[in-house]
Amino acid sequence: MLRSKLCLVLLLGSVVQAQAEGLATDKVRWHGFISQGLIQAPETNFVNLDDSISAELTDIGVNMSWALSDRLRLAGQVVYLDGGRRYTKGTRLDYLFLDWTLHSDFDWRLDMFVGRFKNQHWLYSATRDVPFTRNAIVLPQSVYFDSFRDIAVGSDGLAFKVTRTTSLGEVELNWSWGATNLSKEQSQILLSQLAQGDAEQDYVHQASLFWRPDQSAWQLGISLLDSDFTYEKAEQDYYSDGAMTVQRVMFNGRYAAEYWELSSEWVQERLDIRDFYAPGFTRNSFSQGWYLQGRYNLLPRTWALLGIDLFDLDKDDRSGRQFSASTGGLVPAYFAYQDDLTLGLTYDFKDNLRLTMEHHWVKGTARLAYPVMPDLQYNTSEYWQMWAMQLMYWF
């Protein structure tokens, strides 16, 4: 947290220094956002453990973009996030990278990013922490699993982006290689409080392709992910030394018209676990999920949201019966799936002041903490509900 606060001071200091030195305003730009809300998800461990209405729904951020030259740009953002038990609370360096434009002309452009960059491969992965850029307060958990947020949101490493304009429209290709450092708290959000050892992401390798047809409101895409993790147990630990491989294939589409829009993503994820639970243990499974969200402009400044989000922990065991049987019936079948119906309403008081409200009706608990250790104490119901409201301001 101290490192992130220092980065925030340096980021703000850079802006002040740049302005004091008389740099053109088009060279240095800074923006920010502040949001606060209320949320409740009874009978689950999603937000808290006492079923109460929680104010742990805070997003604050400040970002800067500094054009060092015509081809070189420095960009950074520091955020403070509080999502309750969904992910790590506190201040963090969201991104800080150099963007080097290697080539740019009328038809195509090539950029290289070095440093801590955002995940550009999914529809909302790069902006999921910026409240006014997403359709819902709580994103579809089949794809944007909150317990995995700190790993999925970005990486330290190298990335490239190529955009090409053709007679059929614009094509965008993204490639990245990097890793994310996991703190003890982040590891325990994934592995439960029983984890006393060190979890490490060895690497994450991603690629994505997007196509935006000419004179069309459509965007279609595909993305691939491959990542390895290792776990080194502590002297006194519930788990063993082990390794995991996560691989994803995703398809996505978005249609944005003047008064309505649709967005959807489909994912199949392979999880290969070696040892970890016990020496010699192996498990190889394929989960599947997808969501469809629609927004409609009901009235001036007012949008309605309808979404459906489905997830199955094992595509060959959608009912969860085999999963439950493998635990001797100790873990209910509803821990193997999670289906969500969402209704929401958004009202813009001003161009930069928005109130969003939503309600979720959920069946199953597969996307509640902890991914590798079902929480039978707090996730006690197959059917549960959640509501949230959030006021956001950006500048």
What residues fall within each predicted segment?
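Surface-exposed strand-loop-strand hairpins of Gram-negative outer-membrane beta-barrel proteins
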Residues: 37-58, 188-195
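Outer-membrane beta-barrel pore domains
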Residues: 48-49, 221-395
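Short, solvent-exposed loop/turn and secondary-structure capping segments
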Residues: 43, 124-127, 317, 368
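Transmembrane beta-strand segments of Gram-negative outer membrane beta-barrel proteins
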Residues: 22-45
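Cleavable N-terminal export/targeting peptides
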Residues: 1-23
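Transmembrane beta-barrel strands of outer-membrane/channel proteins
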Residues: 32-40, 76-80, 112-116, 173-179, ...
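Signature for the C-terminal beta-barrel architecture of outer-membrane proteins
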Residues: 101-102, 106-112, 148-292, 296-304
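Outer membrane beta-barrel
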Residues: 27, 37, 51-183, 210-214, ...
